[in-house]
């Protein structure tokens, strides 16, 4: 898929925040389905920017290739979830790996982090996804 305008991700992020504030059911769903999957604190965008500048993190975009090609976090490497086993030997052991996908409720990043940790990698997920990153006017590439 492709978001035609930078305002679209901002609108989606706003709608998500409104739903989170207005619907008690959203809080329960998030707690039951997401927070229980990942005991480690996710990486906030400010932290990721600092880590990347210092060379402390490798950022992987686990979305399908066509989504990555439409736009991605600057410096991120595309490692679609189904291709992760083939990329394992290319991933650095000395750096933390930060995975992201379509947003805070996208299961791809959770799954990638879980698989990486089982293989001995230090991995966390980005707290948000590419749409929120782009809406925040942070560095992106195409």
Residue ranges and their predicted role:
Residues 4-70, 142:
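Flexible, polar/low-complexity N-terminal or interdomain linker segments that lie immediately upstream
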Residues 120-135:
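A short glycine-rich beta-strand->turn/loop micro-motif centered on a GG-aromatic cluster
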Residues 14-15, 71, 90, 136:
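Residue-level signal for well-ordered alpha-helical positions
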Residues 44-111, 142:
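Positively charged, proline/Ser/Thr-rich regional signature most characteristic
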Residues 136-142:
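Short, basic/aromatic-enriched C-terminal tail that caps enzymatic domains
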Residues 58, 122, 139:
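Residue-level detector of anion-binding/catalytic polar loops
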Residues 115-117:
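Hydrophobic alpha-helical packing residues
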């Amino acid at each position: 898929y492709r978001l035609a305008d930078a305002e679209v991700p901002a609108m989606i992020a706003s709608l998500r925040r409104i739903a989170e504030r207005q619907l008690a059911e959203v809080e329960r769903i998030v707690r039951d389905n997401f927070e229980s999957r990942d005991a480690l604190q996710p990486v906030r965008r400010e932290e990721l920017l600092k880590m990347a500048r210092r060379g402390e993190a490798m950022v992987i975009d686990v979305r399908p290739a066509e989504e990555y090609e439409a736009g991605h976090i600057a410096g991120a490497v595309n490692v679609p979830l189904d291709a992760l086993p083939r990329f394992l030997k290319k991933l650095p052991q000395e750096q933390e790996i930060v995975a992201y996908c379509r947003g805070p409720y996208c299961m791809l990043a959770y799954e990638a982090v879980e698989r990486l940790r089982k293989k001995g990698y230090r991995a966390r997920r980005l707290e948000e996804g590419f749409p929120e990153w782009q809406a925040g006017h942070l560095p992106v590439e195409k």
